[in-house]
UniProtKB/Swiss-Prot annotation:
Pfam assignment, any one: SecB
PANTHER family per record: PROTEIN-EXPORT PROTEIN SECB (PTHR36918:SF1), PTHR36918
SUPFAM superfamilies with a match to the protein in the record: SecB-like (SSF54611)
GO cellular component: cytoplasm
InterPro entries named in the record: SecB, SecB-like_sf
Protein name according to UniProt: Protein-export protein SecB
Coiled coil: none
UniProt entry tagged with the keyword Secreted: no
Keyword entries, A-Z: Chaperone, Cytoplasm, Protein transport, Translocation, Transport
Protein species of origin: Coxiella burnetii (strain RSA 493 / Nine Mile phase I)
Gene, per the UniProt record: secB
Cellular localisation: Cytoplasm
GO molecular function terms listed in the Swiss-Prot or TrEMBL record: unfolded protein binding
Any one Gene Ontology BP term: protein transport
Family that this chain belongs to: Belongs to the SecB family.
C-alpha cells in the first residue's frame, strides 16, 4: 500500500535523484621520510587538490569520482601524500538538460566530499601523523568558476573538454 501511495504522489516525469552506491575507488598513502620526520618539530604546509570525473553508465545512472589529493611538506621536504578517489553511482532522471552539469559537477561532489575527507583523515592518523582537519569545500563556487573559465576559452582551439 505504501508503495502505491508513493507512486501516485510522484509524477512519472518528475525529477528523480537517488544515491545507488558510495565507494572508495582508489586509496593511497605515502610517507617517504618516516620515521625520521617524527623527530622533527611539526610545522607542516598543506596543499589540497580536487578533481572530478563523470562516467555515464546508461539508464540515467552516472558514476561521479571525486579525487582528493593532500600533500604535506615541511621546510620544502615532502612529508606525506594522501589521495582518495571517492566514487558514487547516482540515478539522475527527468532533470532539465541545463541542470545536469551542476548536478554532476557540484551536487554529487558535495555528497562525496565528506566521505573522501574522512578517508584522508583516517589514513593520516594511521600513518602516525596528527589528525588533519580539511576545510569544507564550496563545490557550487568551484563549479561556477570552472564554467566561467570554459566560457572564456570558448573562442580558442585549445579548449579542454
Amino acid at each position: 500500500m505504501a508503495e502505491q501511495n508513493q507512486r501516485t504522489n510522484t509524477p512519472d516525469n518528475g525529477p528523480e535523484f537517488a544515491i545507488q552506491r558510495l565507494y572508495i575507488k582508489d586509496l593511497s598513502f605515502e610517507a617517504p621520510r618516516s620515521p625520521q620526520v617524527f623527530l622533527e618539530e611539526w610545522q607542516p604546509e598543506l596543499n589540497m587538490d580536487l578533481a572530478t570525473k563523470v562516467n555515464d553508465l546508461g539508464e540515467d545512472n552516472h558514476e561521479v569520482v571525486l579525487t582528493v589529493t593532500v600533500t604535506v611538506t615541511m621546510k620544502e621536504s615532502h612529508i606525506f601524500l594522501a589521495e582518495v578517489q571517492q566514487g558514487g553511482i547516482f540515478t539522475i532522471k527527468n532533470f532539465p538538460k541545463e541542470e545536469m552539469r551542476p548536478m554532476l559537477g557540484s551536487f554529487c561532489p558535495n555528497i562525496l566530499y565528506p566521505y573522501a575527507r574522512e578517508a584522508i583523515t583516517d589514513m593520516v592518523v594511521r600513518g602516525g601523523f596528527p589528525q588533519l582537519y580539511l576545510a569544507p569545500v564550496n563545490f557550487d563556487a568551484l563549479f561556477e568558476q570552472h564554467e566561467q573559465s570554459e566560457e572564456g576559452n570558448s573562442g580558442t582551439e585549445d579548449r579542454v573538454h
